[in-house]
């Protein structure tokens, strides 16, 4: 679907409240690429804005920034695509999205075969980018305590 990233974001923002904990995308991917509404092997050389990658991230960041309004204080994004977080291009893409949306963004480093219960978890190692280039400890310490819980 052409302009599928815009359509997906519009649908999500229209349906979600302001306290989303996890937003998970499933689709085709490779290092530094997350397909949102595209099929496998389109390969026509035209940017249909149906995937997020290094060639279109600057055009799509204003669209993706609209997702910031749906997240609660511990919100995060996961791309359940094959290898999206692999290599420098994958890590750079995830960091740009984390900085733009203001939540941690995680993606797989290897192929994700899916099927059955594996569809709902990462298969193998992942990379997580935190807003501002922070790490897990610093990001968590900047979050409010969960109501009714205190840190140990």
Question: Could you tell me what each predicted segment is?
Answer:
Residues 26, 33-116:
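Catalytic cores of nucleophile-dependent amide-cleaving enzymes
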Residues 3, 19, 56, 76, ...:
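Detector for Asparagine
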Residues 1-51, 150-152:
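Glycine-rich short-loop/terminal segments
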Residues 107-152:
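Caspase-like cysteine protease fold
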Residues 6-10, 61, 65-68, 137:
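Generic detector of well-ordered alpha-helical segments enriched in charged/polar residues
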